[in-house]
Amino acid sequence: MEKITASVRLKKTRGERNRLLKEGKVPGVMYGKNIEPVAVAVNARELESLVERGLKLFELSVEGKTQRVLVKELQHHPVTGKLIHVDFQVVESGRKIRQLVPVELYGEPAGVKAGGILEHGLSEVTVECLPEDLPEFIEADVSKLEVGDCLRVKDLELPPGVRVIEDPESIIALISAPRDYVEEEEETTTSAPEATA
């Protein structure tokens, strides 16, 4: 399991936060069940490297003590997009967690080959599982979807030990008819002669 080191922040002022950001560090907080919240700071590049690879569960070493943590929330600057704060949740072995996991679509839908349009629904789903079973992402095969078909949460193939906490009927992806096809159908319906008695 990946591991990064954090230092304890003694000050929690705006000036201290700005100083840390200038030094290439990200201020954050580590918390968990029966654990007092601890203000920490981590190397921005190390954290961004893990996050970019989809890793949200790793070990965090604070003053020589290592905890397994989950990245619960990331805050970015609204203008620059720079990472400015992180929340770490300490996880316990044997205790299930809930976490947002991205859904990655793969395959070229049959309906798209026929001229349809692939539309995206949920791009992330909340899953419940043990920390060691947490997937980086969930793959969804859309290659068999025809025009008018959709892939729902209940259709997802999940790894062992993982359960999705979402409405089973929520749409992940659907194949809609091309606009000109819809317009042609509407014109045909409108121009069809009415049956006379």
Curated annotation (Swiss-Prot):
Any single Pfam family the record assigns to this protein = Ribosomal_L25p
Keywords from the UniProt entry = Ribonucleoprotein, Ribosomal protein, RNA-binding, rRNA-binding
What InterPro entries does the annotation carry? Rbsml_bL25/Gln-tRNA_synth_N (IPR020056), Ribosomal_bL25/Gln-tRNA_synth (IPR011035), Ribosomal_bL25_b-dom (IPR020057), Ribosomal_bL25_C (IPR037121), Ribosomal_bL25_long (IPR001021), Ribosomal_L25_dom (IPR029751), Ribosomal_uL5_bac-type (IPR020930)
TM regions (residue ranges): none
Give the domain of life. Bacteria
SUPFAM superfamilies hit by this protein: Ribosomal protein L25-like
Record's signal peptide? none
GO biological process, any: translation
Would you tell me the Gene Ontology cellular component terms? cytosolic large ribosomal subunit
User: Could you tell me which HAMAP family the record lists for this protein?
Assistant: Ribosomal_bL25_CTC
What protein family does this chain belong to? Belongs to the bacterial ribosomal protein bL25 family. CTC subfamily.
Which named protein is this?
Large ribosomal subunit protein bL25
Can you name the source organism?
Answer: Carboxydothermus hydrogenoformans (strain ATCC BAA-161 / DSM 6008 / Z-2901)
